[in-house]
Curated annotation (Swiss-Prot):
GO cellular component: plasma membrane
MF terms (GO), sorted A to Z: undecaprenyl-diphosphatase activity
Organism whose genome encodes this protein: Pseudarthrobacter chlorophenolicus (strain ATCC 700700 / DSM 12829 / CIP 107037 / JCM 12360 / KCTC 9906 / NCIMB 13794 / A6)
The enzyme's E.C. designation: 3.6.1.27
Protein name stated in the entry: Undecaprenyl-diphosphatase
One Pfam family hit: BacA
């Protein structure tokens, strides 16, 4: 067991999950520079994301409790479905459908061919440029009370793009939000809430497979993965507050340049054979 490696990967997961730079890409990249030079694997990535998503639940627990109560009340007919919190509950469910369906349909590709470092590098650059355009041209006038069901499903398809490492779940959803005219902070908040069902679903499914039958694939076993998950939770909790404050006053330009630089650096490293695809 290499506890230093998994601690580092947990730190990376916590630092990058909520930033629009793709945590799965960073786990894939950092894995290449560790002594065993292996991909940590889709299962390791999904399970460690349980840590960062638990940080979302803890950070937003008041909002989540309020939304769940209102949504449950709307099911029972005690609360109007037009109640802002009840609507948010339905919007999160609606927005989660694309990633659930596409994740199941393309599970084999997601866990194999789509983890190619060439694809990671390309997605970092392409979606970095799209984020730059969205940040520049988005009107940034709408808040979450103006979120429509149509926009909710579009957010959902943007989130589903993050099944490809390098796209970034938060980056995809934030980009979609900006293009639809939402403020930076509103786009980020809905991105956090929207991720809860998808990330918990994926992580718990992978955990079930590990515990019940398959065993974890990749270089790290369940104890190491558990440590990485705990570290990801602690670091992720800190990052959420920082990121929301950052985007309330600053543009996403810093993340755009970082994505482009990292993507180009990966092309060079792959081209010269320093790392393998």
């Amino acid at each position: 067991m290499n506890w230093f490696e998994v601690a580092l990967l947990g730190l990376v997961q916590g630092l990058t999950e909520f930033l629009p730079i793709s945590s799965s890409a960073h786990l894939r990249i950092v894995g290449q520079f560790l002594p065993n030079a292996e991909d940590p694997g889709a299962a390791f990535t999904a399970i460690t994301q349980l840590g960062t998503e638990t940080a979302v639940v803890v950070y937003f627990w008041r909002d989540i409790v309020r939304i769940v109560k209102a949504w449950a009340g709307s099911l029972a007919g005690k609360v109007s479905r037009q109640d802002p919190d009840a609507r948010m509950g339905w919007l999160v469910i609606l927005g989660s459908l694309p990633i659930i369906v596409l994740g199941l349909l393309f599970q084999d590709q997601i866990e194999s061919v789509l983890r190619s470092m060439w694809i990671v590098a390309t997605m970092l650059i392409v979606f970095g440029l799209i984020l730059a355009v969205a940040d520049a041209v988005g009107k940034q006038e709408r808040d979450l009370t103006q979120l429509t069901y149509k926009h909710g499903i579009l957010y959902g398809f943007a989130q589903a793009m993050a099944l490809i490492p390098g796209v970034s779940r938060s980056g995809g959803t934030i980009t979609a939000g900006l293009l639809m005219g939402y403020t930076r902070e509103a786009a980020a908040r809905y991105s956090f809430l929207l991720a809860i069902p998808a990330v918990f679903g994926s992580g718990l499914y992978q955990l079930y497979k590990v515990v019940s039958k398959d065993g974890i694939t990749g270089p790290y076993g369940l104890p190491e993965t558990a440590l990485a998950t705990v570290i990801a939770f602690v670091v992720g909790y800190v990052i959420i507050g920082w990121f929301l404050k950052f985007v309330s006053t600053r543009s996403y330009r810093l993340f755009v340049w970082y994505r482009i630089f990292l993507g180009l650096a990966l092309y060079l490293l792959l081209g010269f054979g320093v790392i393998s695809a």
